[in-house]
Amino acid sequence: MAAKEIIYNESARSMILAGVNALADAVKVTLGPKGRNVVIEKSFGSPTVTKDGVTVAKEIELENRFENMGAQMVREVASKTSDIAGDGTTTATVLAQAIYREGSKLVAAGHNPMEIKRGIDKAVEAIVEHLRGSAKQTKDAKEIAQVGTISANGDETIGKLLADAMEKVGKEGVITVEEAKSADTTLDVVEGMQFDRGYLSPYFVTDPEAMKANLEDCYILISEKKISNMKDLLPVLEAIAKSQKQLLIIAEDVEGEALATLVVNKLRGTLHCAAVKAPGFGDRRKEMLKDIATLTDGQVIAEELGLKLENVTISDLGRAKTVIIDKDNTTIVGGQGKKDKIKARQQEIRAQIENTTSDYDREKLQERLAKLVGGVAVVKVGAATETEMKEKKARVEDALHATRAAVEEGIVPGGGVALIRAQSSLEKLKVNDEQRFGVNIIRRAIEEPLRQISANAGEEGSIVVQKVRDGKDSYGYNAASGDYGNLLEMGVIDPVKVVRSALQNAASVASLMLTTEALIAERPKEEKPAAGGAHAGHGHDF
């Protein structure tokens, strides 16, 4: 085992502080509407230009291993905040730096770090309570657009696009961000349920120009098994041919004789039909087929339910107003499912989202929920160069998370003002003298985001903080325009979830670092010179 190096007490804390400052000073220049960019070198390709705090934080590795520990702890603050709220990473970093900087002075002066930590925890609890109490629920698309604009660093087009997307697919709908092929940023909305399986044969196409198969007012047969034998399908095909309706078959696969018969009937015009493979794999496929069945008021034909293909009647089939199939996707619009059953299915999926621990499963469940609730919106981000595209895409993703957070827990005045207003909640706290120091650390630290926003805008932080503190409610400083006024009316707003998560994560990690007394790291290995180098080339005979 390699030898370890250990440092204690004051030297440990000063090393942590040096690491915290190195990372936070690089991140905090990006805060606010007048924040600056950071350029990051890449081992290949062009450098990345970013104004996103967590992207900067993730790139920082310090040479000194003890300082690096401090930097990595603060990096954890930024990435945790990004995971929970999707935004507020720079605010969280600024708060963590302020809490640790103030706290380490007190610990050095001989105060009890455990009591300080308790004071910090109580203060954070009081502020979170105050933030939740003063939250205003987002009602209209305009407010959602304002949240998106601020999170996208003042880009109004992004804010408006996201507000449109939310209006079209609902608050639970899935909004995805993709790179566009052109320089324009656009919004595509897919209504109804779409899954990534196309037609099994191009002979099903009804619109040769667009290469799409369109079915109107059709029946939908949903089977879990592979269909290859024509005999099994005959009874249901005859019934549908009599009813003069159209048919979509969704099955594990349709092949051989069964597929050939469907194609021949389609070409002869005796039966207007199409077949696609079922989406997903394994258990997820079963669940997705149940979703389609619920949406269209059909029945999944599965042997475990005692249903066989040859016994299927028209009443077991789903119904939909329109089905559009291209070579890659199938979209079902206007499913005839019963509202109460669809609601029950949505609740079931929501419960699974609450209980799952896997991020991948959660993402897939949210996609399924969105398809049942209303649809999917795709924001296609366009830019003139790839460097700009990457930077813009990161901003759109941030803005998307922020708008979701705003819808979830409501909004408060932005620009660091909500935290200043929450200072009043610290007056009534019952704490002992040592804990009071912890409370005072938080009182001072929560001014830091506003100070930094002002400094980045070229103003003197202390003067701005004093002016804002003298005001009431939503009165604050709009760094984008340089004016003071009602921030809610000006559209300078932050989601409660973002502000809350930033403070909670910053306080959690900073107070842990305050109670640290020793750091242990591996001693660097000394490089030995290569053996035999001195005698090489002297013509020895062996």
UniProtKB/Swiss-Prot annotation:
InterPro entries: Chaperonin_Cpn60_CS, Cpn60/GroEL, Cpn60/GroEL/TCP-1, GroEL-like_apical_dom_sf, GROEL-like_equatorial_sf, TCP-1-like_intermed_sf. Its EC number is 5.6.1.7. ATP binds at residues 30-33, 51, 87-91, 415, 478-480, 494. Signal peptide: none annotated. GO terms for biological process: protein refolding. Gene3D superfamilies: GroEL, GroEL-like equatorial domain, TCP-1-like chaperonin intermediate domain. PROSITE patterns: CHAPERONINS_CPN60. One of its GO terms (molecular function) is isomerase activity. It catalyses: ATP + H2O + a folded polypeptide = ADP + phosphate + an unfolded polypeptide. Coiled coil: none annotated. Keywords: ATP-binding, Chaperone, Cytoplasm, Isomerase, Nucleotide-binding. The keyword Chaperone applies. It comes from the Bacteria. It is an enzyme of class 5 (isomerase). One of its GO terms (cellular component) is cytoplasm. It is found in: Cytoplasm. Pfam families: Cpn60_TCP1. NCBIfam families: GroEL, PRK00013.1, PRK12849.1, PRK12850.1, PRK12851.1. Together with its co-chaperonin GroES, plays an essential role in assisting protein folding. The GroEL-GroES system forms a nano-cage that allows encapsulation of the non-native substrate proteins and provides a physical environment optimized to promote and accelerate protein folding. PANTHER family: 60 KDA HEAT SHOCK PROTEIN, MITOCHONDRIAL. Forms a cylinder of 14 subunits composed of two heptameric rings stacked back-to-back. Interacts with the co-chaperonin GroES. Belongs to the chaperonin (HSP60) family. This is Chaperonin GroEL 2. It comes from Sorangium cellulosum (strain So ce56) (Polyangium cellulosum (strain So ce56)). The lineage of its organism: Bacteria, Pseudomonadati, Myxococcota, Polyangia, Polyangiales.
